[in-house]
């Protein structure tokens, strides 16, 4: 009964045991190609796997390693069963997708086994297409790169052409823009300073000068005849400037340039003497002096850039006689403007004080001289202080020494001499001497010879004037400098350059001492100080905008370091860097420091300066832009000033980045000060970033202003070594500064050389300190309606304190001075670290500098030659190191 139930169906009949694959094979639809067998040994599976992975991922929508590996494993067999593969894949991919997948995969395998390489022809075609596409893409990329490169090349060429144009044309543009505008604007500033509507005009002229040399030319157009001459001289100078800009990069070429500088100095002295004769008449007409000073500013800048010395000799003779143009040219914008105005004022004072010396250059501004002359007795203090207050003067002094007539003026008028020195020293010595010291390497074109000159003069002149000055009062030194000036002008700009240098060192030592003394006297007699410091520095810089010139002049010694930095820049952009040099002694300072120290940054600026000159040129062009715009022109002037002033700021910025921006910004703040007639308005224009810069840059100028802008700036100048000292002997910022100042003072010859090394970093650090401490001062001045005056008053009070400190520090500085001389080499390596200490040490260094400089007046003269040699070597080493590392 039950038998049938269990026997009813066989296993085959029971679907539970049926061969399901057979059923599926019968039921499923397969692509026709699957009928063909594939020999996997002939197939390059590695080429197929990427396609399988891609396809499965497309089907599933995600990358399933299990499925992919399952497929790979099935294909590992020599002769895989295509239908079974499809059946097996149906569970992972649905039936339709599995069929499609196998329909695509199998033809690939079939073509691959037919191909020798085992690669499907489709893949080969795809590869070919891909290769073609890649080639096309590469070609496109290459063409794009080429286009980019071409564009870059074009841009570079355009920039080079522009730079060349700026150099050739803009020996006018730059020299016109920066120097000429400065000079023109400086003459304008003279008028404006006089009228106190100078700043607006200054801006206008700055703009016009900056927007186009045409405007500058238009400004000087009143003296088109002078311009042609200037053009000739400027062209010659531009040639020399252009060469020097490049040559300023190599120290050796600079020395070569020096000889041309001397020759060109003589020629320019002749030309400038001619222009002096004109300038007296033109000094009568400010427009003439403006156009002249602008025109001279161009030639002078070329002269400067060519041979800052030659310009300085010329400037010395001519700036004295043509003081407004010349000094103004030295202050190219700020200095020249302010300095000329100031110079005119002071030269007026000087004229009154000594009409003979100021008569030629001061006769233009005899009226202003009386005011300065009022300070004339203080100016004598200023004269001494002009040593201290005129670190720029010191440079100017050295530079005026080249021009005997100017020196007589100086001698007649301490202020005039100081101012002349400031403007000139800062212009010419600042550029020549400071460049000599600091840019001896970078500036060596003017500076190398100047350094040798200074060394020579430091031997002859320092022996003469140094000992005399050390033994005698500043007047002997001045007379000695006069003699040296005359002899230098007689012997040529070479002796004047030499005199500049020794005088500078003497001036640094003696004058700084005297400056300190005068700063003492100034601080004791705020009116003299304010007159010279505040009026001359401040008025130049800030209130009259001549004080800025003065400050810039006073900074000019420090700016010469900056010049160093911008020797090529100053040379190329010497117009703008000269302002830097002039206006920001701190800036110059720090720039010089950078130049010296980071000859690389400075070289970047200066030696690297050929490129940085573009930057500076760019900066000049920006400056030009600034000039173009009222606030930009202020910025430009201010920025040159700021660059000079903010050398500290700029030095910090430049340390980090020689960014022309910081320079510009700093420039613009200085410009604020420069446009002291409306410095604050400009401050507002330039002050957006420059207000801080203004605090920093203005601070440094104010510091200069406040400490006796010229005195402190110069101290900074000589402190440039001091910051090194500060680093080397950071016993205290003050002691460091004392040491630094003693080094810079007693080692002023030494600092002069060391300024190559030490000043670069000290300048930077000092500049930062100038930035910081001046920034503090500048803050109050900036906040106060008359920041310059406040800073001057503060500077007066601080100077008094510093003078006291200086007295105490003298002994320390003397000791430290010797130590620092040894340390300077080591300190040169620590410019950055010195920067912080320099903030405090910058003030104290200034204080200390006066003492050591006074003390070192006699000592440094003997040691100046040796010190200068050592310092030059150190500076060259530091510059080379900086050139090697910072540019990279």
Curated annotation (Swiss-Prot):
Which spans does this entry mark as compositional bias, Basic and acidic residues? 139-169, 213-232, 254-276, 662-677, 866-876
Q: Does the keyword Nucleus apply?
A: yes
Q: Which GO terms describe its cellular component?
A: spliceosomal complex
- Principal subcellular localisation of the protein: nucleus
Instruction: Spell out the molecular function terms from Gene Ontology.
Output: RNA binding
Any one Gene Ontology biological process term? RNA splicing
> Which keywords fit this entry according to its UniProt record?
mRNA processing, mRNA splicing, Nucleus
Per the record, which residues fall in region Disordered?
139-888
Locate the PWI domain: which residues?
27-126
Biased region (Low complexity) positions are 348-364, 473-496, 586-598, 697-712, 728-749, 763-775, 826-843
Entries under PROSITE patterns matching the protein: PWI
Compositionally biased intervals (Basic residues): 170-206, 277-325, 332-347, 528-554, 561-585, 614-629, 642-656, 798-823
- Cite the record's Polar residues compositional bias ranges: 780-790
Query: Where found?
Result: Nucleus
UniProt similarity note? Belongs to the splicing factor SR family.
Q: What does this protein do?
A: Involved in pre-mRNA splicing and processing events.
Put simply, this protein is called Serine/arginine repetitive matrix protein 1
Q: What organism is the protein native to?
A: Gallus gallus
């Amino acid at each position: 009964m039950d038998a049938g139930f269990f026997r009813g169906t066989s296993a085959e009949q029971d679907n539970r045991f049926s061969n399901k694959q057979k059923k599926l094979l019968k039921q499923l639809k397969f692509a026709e190609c699957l009928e063909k067998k594939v020999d996997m040994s002939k197939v390059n599976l590695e080429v197929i796997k990427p396609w399988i992975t891609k396809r499965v991922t497309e089907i599933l929508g995600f990358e399933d390693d299990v499925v992919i590996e399952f497929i790979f494993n099935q294909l590992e067999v020599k002769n895989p069963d295509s239908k079974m593969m499809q059946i097996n894949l149906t569970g992972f991919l649905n039936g339709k997708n599995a069929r499609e997948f196998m329909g695509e995969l199998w033809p690939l395998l079939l073509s691959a086994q037919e191909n020798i390489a085992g690669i499907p022809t489709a893949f080969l075609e795809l590869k070919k297409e891909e290769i073609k596409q890649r080639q096309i893409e590469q070609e496109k990329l290459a063409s794009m790169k080429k286009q980019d490169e071409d564009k870059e090349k074009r841009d570079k060429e355009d920039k080079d052409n522009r730079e060349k144009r700026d150099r050739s044309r803009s020996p006018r543009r730059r020299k016109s823009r920066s120097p000429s505008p400065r000079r023109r604007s400086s003459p304008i500033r003279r008028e404006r300073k006089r009228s106190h509507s100078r700043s607006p005009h200054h801006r206008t002229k700055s703009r016009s000068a900056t927007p186009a040399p045409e405007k500058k030319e238009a400004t000087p157009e009143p003296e088109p005849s002078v311009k042609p001459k200037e053009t000739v001289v400027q062209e010659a100078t531009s040639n020399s400037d252009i060469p020097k800009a490049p040559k300023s990069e190599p120290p050796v070429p600079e020395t070569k340039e020096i000889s041309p500088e001397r020759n060109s100095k003589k020629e320019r002295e002749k030309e400038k003497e001619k222009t002096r004769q004109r300038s007296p008449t033109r000094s009568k007409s400010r427009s003439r002096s403006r156009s002249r000073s602008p025109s001279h500013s161009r030639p002078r800048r070329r002269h400067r850039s060519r041979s800052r010395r030659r310009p300085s000799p010329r400037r010395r003779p001519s700036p004295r006689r043509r003081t407004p143009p010349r000094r103004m040219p030295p202050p190219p914008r700020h200095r020249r403007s302010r300095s000329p105005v100031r110079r005119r004022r002071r030269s007026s004072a000087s004229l009154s004080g000594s009409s003979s010396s100021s008569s030629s250059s001061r006769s233009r501004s005899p009226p202003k001289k009386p005011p300065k002359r009022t300070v004339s007795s203080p100016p004598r203090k200023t004269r001494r202080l002009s040593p201290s207050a005129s670190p720029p003067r010191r440079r100017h002094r050295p530079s005026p020494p080249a021009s005997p007539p100017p020196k007589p003026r100086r001698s007649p008028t301490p202020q005039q001499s100081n101012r002349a020195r400031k403007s000139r020293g800062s212009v010419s010595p600042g550029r020549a001497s400071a460049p000599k010291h600091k840019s001896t390497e970078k500036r060596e074109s003017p500076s190398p010879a100047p350094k040798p000159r200074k060394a020579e003069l430091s031997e002859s002149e320092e022996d003469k004037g140094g000992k005399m000055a050390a033994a005698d009062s500043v007047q002997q030194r001045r007379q000695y400098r006069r003699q040296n000036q005359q002899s230098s002008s007689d012997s040529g700009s070479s002796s004047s350059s030499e005199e500049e240098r020794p005088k500078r060192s003497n001036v640094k030592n003696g004058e700084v001492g005297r400056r300190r003394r005068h700063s003492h006297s100034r601080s004791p007699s705020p009116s003299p100080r304010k007159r010279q410091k505040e009026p001359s520095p401040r008025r130049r810089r800030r209130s009259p905008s001549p004080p800025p010139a003065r400050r810039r002049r006073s900074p000019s010694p420090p700016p010469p370091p900056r010049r160093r930095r911008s020797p090529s820049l100053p040379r190329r952009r010497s117009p703008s860097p000269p302002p830097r040099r002039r206006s920001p002694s701190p800036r110059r300072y720090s720039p010089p420091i950078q130049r010296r120290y980071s000859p690389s940054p400075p070289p970047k600026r200066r030696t690297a300066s050929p490129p940085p000159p573009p930057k500076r040129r760019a900066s000049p062009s920006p400056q030009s832009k600034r000039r173009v715009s009222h606030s930009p022109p202020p910025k430009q002037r201010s920025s040159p000033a700021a660059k000079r002033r903010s050398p500290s700021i700029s030095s910090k910025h430049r340390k980090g980045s020689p960014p022309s921006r910081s320079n510009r910004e700093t420039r613009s703040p200085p410009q604020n000060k420069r446009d002291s007639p409306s410095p604050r308005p400009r401050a507002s224009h330039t002050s957006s970033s420059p207000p801080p810069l203004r605090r920093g840059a203005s601070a440094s100028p104010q510091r200069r202003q406040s400490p006796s802008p010229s005195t402190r700036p110069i101290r900074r100048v000589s402190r440039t070594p001091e910051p090194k000292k500060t680093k080397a002997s950071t016993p205290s910022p003050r002691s460091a500064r004392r040491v630094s100042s003693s080094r810079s003072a007693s080692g002023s010859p030494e600092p002069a050389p060391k300024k190559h090394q030490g000043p670069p970093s000290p300048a930077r650090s000092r500049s930062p300190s100038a930035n910081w401490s001046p920034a503090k001062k500048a803050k109050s001045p900036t906040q106060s309606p008359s920041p310059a005056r406040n800073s001057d008053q503060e500077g007066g009070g601080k100077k008094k304190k510093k003078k006291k400190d200086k007295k105490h520090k003298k002994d320390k500085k003397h000791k430290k001075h010797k130590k620092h001389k040894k340390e300077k080499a080591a300190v040169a390596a620590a410019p950055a670290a010195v920067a912080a200490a320099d903030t405090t040490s910058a003030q104290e260094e200034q204080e200390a500098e006066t003492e050591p400089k006074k003390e070192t007046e006699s000592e440094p003269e003997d040691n100046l030659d040796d010190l200068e040699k050592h310092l030059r070597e150190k500076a060259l080493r530091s510059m080379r190191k900086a050139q090697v590392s910072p540019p990279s």
